[in-house]
UniProtKB/Swiss-Prot annotation:
GO molecular function: cobalt-precorrin-7 C15-methyltransferase activity; protein methyltransferase activity
Entry's EC annotation: 2.1.1.289
Taxonomic placement: Archaea, Methanobacteriati, Methanobacteriota, Methanomada group, Methanococci
Keyword annotations from UniProtKB, A to Z: Cobalamin biosynthesis, Methyltransferase, S-adenosyl-L-methionine, Transferase
Name of the molecule in the record: Probable cobalt-precorrin-7 C(5)-methyltransferase
Taxonomic superkingdom: Archaea
Homology family: Belongs to the precorrin methyltransferase family.
Record-linked Pfam families: TP_methylase (PF00590)
Encoding gene (name): cbiE
GO BP terms, alphabetized: cobalamin biosynthetic process; methylation
Reaction catalyzed: Co-precorrin-7 + S-adenosyl-L-methionine = Co-precorrin-8X + S-adenosyl-L-homocysteine + H(+)
Pathway linked to the protein: Cofactor biosynthesis; adenosylcobalamin biosynthesis; cob(II)yrinate a,c-diamide from sirohydrochlorin (anaerobic route): step 8/10
Length: 211
């Protein structure tokens, strides 16, 4: 059985008891170096993923030697939103061989930090989804509230400006949520287009200003 384990936004305090239990009982634990460091795992049980993540996961699910083992694959945030569930299904894993363990998403943390009800917001990920930039553009043009995970925040901001959004439009930028270097700032698109930001970023547009 393959368990896709949501590990939350990064701080160990946001791990669920279920996630900890699954990892403790797993025969193999697979994840990025940063994800693996959240747990106390014997070295012989670890598999560290690299930038060739898709190729490595393909090899893993095709490996006959793991068929009867408990495999925990660590997914940042929640595996069902911009996480590894979709990736695994795309590369050939079968739903009946998978159990998804929910985790706390950075979207939820961002909403808590800004004290907003995320049920009132559209939620979009731009991670590897060029077409979603257009969706984001239309939402902002229509003054809709939106929480989004940027792909390249600087370039995303330039895209919005180049397609008619006022450069002074304000966006909340929440970087490295739950880490010691967490930073939350309200910036204009113009400032964002000229800035540098962490790749661990959530953005929030509150939808209540003139474009």
């Amino acid at each position: 059985m393959i368990y896709i384990v949501g590990i939350g936004p990064g701080d160990r305090e946001y791990l669920t008891l279920k996630a900890i239990k699954i990892v403790e009982n797993a025969d193999l634990v697979v994840g990025s170096k940063r994800a693996l460091e959240l747990f106390n795992i014997d070295e012989d049980k670890k598999i560290t993923l690299t930038k060739n993540l898709i190729g490595e996961l393909k090899e893993l699910i095709k490996n006959e030697n793991i068929k009867n083992k408990k495999i925990a694959i660590l997914s940042t945030g929640d595996p069902c939103f911009s996480g590894l569930l979709k990736t695994l299904l795309k590369i050939g894993a079968k739903k009946e061989d998978i159990e998804a363990i929910s985790g706390i998403s950075s979207i939820q943390i961002a909403a808590a930090k800004l004290k907003i009800s995320w049920e009132d917001y559209y939620i979009i990920t731009l991670h590897g989804k060029e077409e979603n930039r257009k969706k984001l553009l239309n939402l902002i043009k229509n003054h809709e509230k939106v929480i989004f995970l940027p792909n390249n925040l600087k370039e995303d901001a330039k895209f919005l400006i180049n397609n008619g959004i006022n450069p002074d439009t304000k966006i909340w930028v929440l970087e490295n949520l739950t880490y010691e270097n967490e930073k939350i700032s309200l910036k204009s698109l113009k400032e964002i287009a000229n800035g540098d930001f962490s790749y661990l970023t959530v953005c929030v547009y509150e939808g209540d200003e003139e474009i």
